[in-house]
Design a protein with these regions (language model features):
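Short, flexible, solvent-exposed loop/turn segments with mixed acidic/basic and small polar residues
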Residues: 79-84, 115-121, 252
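Small-residue-enriched alpha-helical segments and adjacent helix-cap loops
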Residues: 65, 90-239, 263-264
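Iron-sulfur cluster-binding cysteine motifs and their immediate structural context
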Residues: 239-260, 270-286
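Intrinsically disordered, low-complexity polar/charged tails and linkers
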Residues: 63-87
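Short beta-strand elements
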Residues: 78-82, 218-223, 287-295
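A hydrophobic, small-residue-rich beta->alpha segment in the mid-to-C-terminal subdomain
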Residues: 285, 294-329
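Single conserved hydrophobic/aromatic residue that forms the stacking wall/gate
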Residues: 330-341
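Rhodanese-like catalytic fold shared by cysteine-dependent sulfurtransferases
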Residues: 1-63
């Protein structure tokens, strides 16, 4: 029985009848049992892990999906579940890991109607609907589209953009939500039909805390706050609040004045505003861009570009140039990091 068809009284089945629910996987049987209970069917029992009971057969049980179809739906964001022969896990795109309550309800309803009822998060912050039968893939996609959602996030393309919560976090130096959403529209959607040499991952971090590991992505962006010291206002205090605040200890009082070593400062901005005499009030906000990061079987930290960019437009331009550079390597079969050829 299709869960989606249980929307009230079931024709031909009385609410007081005793019913045996036979299911290859017990989970769906229990979801159906709960759904039927909601509509007044309270005399039900679930038989787990069975394909038949007497003359009752489970439709399409263990029907294998052709390899060509497995490949095709993978391109739509549905990955084959190795525990089964006809179930897939579908990835719902979230833009940057942030969804509305309405979208969340739609995803939960889709999981119940077309999947196993389970939902998981991926490392790229997409929402994965588990246990979708092959025949339910297109109905699921149509249902999601009606609610402004889409599946995807697979293949040798620009992958879903990830972002930390820098927009709301106390340490965030840039609006990570706005920037990642713009990157999502311009490059995830804008380059959706462009086949790259390998998947291309982008991450946006609000500060040097690196919570989403931007430097381990093909391209990473990290918010920056570059402090500017007014030496005339510095009194060389024995207990310097700027020095005490610096988490990586690159601010030091030398010869009666505070000095910040810019060559090793990570521009977290924690020291800005901490001097009671306002010696470190001025600052420049910006974006540091890393290229060539990688994680997986092999791990490599990306290298940052020397320039700290001060406008969003500059950053978007760099992102596009990096993707185009990556695209120029389409003839190379071996996955290549950008920093290797930059």
């Amino acid at each position: 029985m299709d869960l989606a068809s249980v929307n009230g009284e079931i024709p031909g089945i009385g609410r007081d009848e005793k019913l045996l629910l036979v299911c290859v996987r017990g989970k769906r049987g229990y979801f159906l049992q709960n759904r039927m209970k909601y509509y007044g069917y309270k005399n039900t029992v679930v038989l787990e892990g069975a394909t038949s009971f007497n003359d009752v057969k489970v439709k399409n049980a263990q029907a294998a999906v052709p390899p060509a179809e497995v490949t095709r739906v993978k391109g739509l964001g549905f990955l084959f579940d190795k525990r089964t022969q006809d179930r897939f896990n579908g990835r719902v795109i979230t833009r940057n890991g942030k969804i509305t309550a309405e979208e969340s309800r739609a995803i939960a309803q889709a999981a119940e109607l077309y999947g196993s009822g389970e939902i998981a998060m991926t490392s790229r912050l997409t929402v994965e609907i588990q246990g979708v039968p092959f025949d339910n893939i297109e109905p699921l996609r149509e249902f999601l589209a009606q609610n402004g959602l889409e599946t995807g996030g697979t293949g040798s393309k620009v992958r879903p953009v990830v972002s930390c919560k820098g927009t709301t976090c106390q340490y965030g130096l840039i609006d990570t939500f706005a920037l990642s959403e713009e990157i999502h529209e311009k490059f995830y959607h804008g380059y959706h039909d462009v086949k790259l040499p390998h998947k291309f991952k982008i991450a946006v971090g609000g500060c040097p805390n690196n919570c989403v590991k931007p430097d381990l992505n093909d391209l990473g962006i990290i918010g920056q706050r570059i402090p500017q010291v007014d030496l005339e206002k510095c009194r060389g205090c024995k207990v310097c609040q700027v020095e005490n605040t610096c988490p990586i200890k690159v601010a030091k009082v030398r010869d009666g004045k505070v000095v910040i070593d810019d060559s090793i400062c990570n521009h977290c901005g924690r020291c800005v505003g901490k001097c009671p005499f306002k010696a470190v009030e001025a600052h420049q906000d910006g974006y540091r861009v890393y290229i060539g990061g990688r994680w997986g079987k092999k791990v490599a930290q990306g290298k940052y570009l020397d320039k700290v960019f001060t406008t969003k437009e500059e950053v978007l331009n760099v992102v596009e140039k990096a993707i185009l550079l990556f695209l120029s390597l389409i003839h190379i079969s071996e996955p290549t990091r950008l920093d290797v050829i930059s």
